[in-house]
Amino acid sequence: LPYVNRMLEEYETAHSYLECDENSLFKALFAAVDAKDMPGMTDVDSSLLYFCSLVSRKNKVALTGECADEIFGGYPWFYRKELLERYGFPWSSDVAPRLALLRDDVGLELDLSGYQAFRYEESRSKAPLLYGEAGEDESRRIIGYLNIKWFMQTLLDRMDRTSMYSELEARVPFADHRIIEYVFNVPWHMKYQNGVEKTLLRDAFSDVLPPELLHRKKSPYP
């Protein structure tokens, strides 16, 4: 809330304070499955659906921040060595919780671990590598590609389905293909400096945002 108040003070804009408690989160779970037309990310989906439904009561178009972390390297797997070197999709390293939802015989028949490894190798082989890159630079380029190819698509689909279900048009400016194409080839040392992620993005808004907002640590959601 202090950051919101600072923003209001700086820009004198009109904002509504929306809050989602556990009960509201729970009530929106089944509607979130309907909105996505398949099982999803439980509370992550239901909280987004809840807020979209509230926003749509007064506004029919909204700007969102989807894709900034995927493009500018905001996730830990871009800069934490142990995650960077881990085999497999960094956002889905353990299939055990998924298998626990299935009967043992069904889990064995599906072989989710094998399928995941196959898809990872297949996708990794298609990453557009740069001649002369190696080591961590090459690994980050591969992870960046995997983020755009898989993780980002999941978030865009989730936002589109959830917002449309709520009669809200959500626009995603960071997903502009011109931004993605340009930033994908920007050297890592320009995206991450002095232990701070998304440095390039922060620098781009350094003359627009107050320092306390510009350098605020990312807050997990929900």
What are these regions (language model features)?
Residues 1-132, 138-140, 161-208:
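ATP-dependent adenylate-handling active sites, centered on carboxylate activation for C-N bond formation
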Residues 156, 208-209:
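Conserved cytochrome P450 K-helix E-x-x-R motif and the immediately C-terminal K′/meander segment
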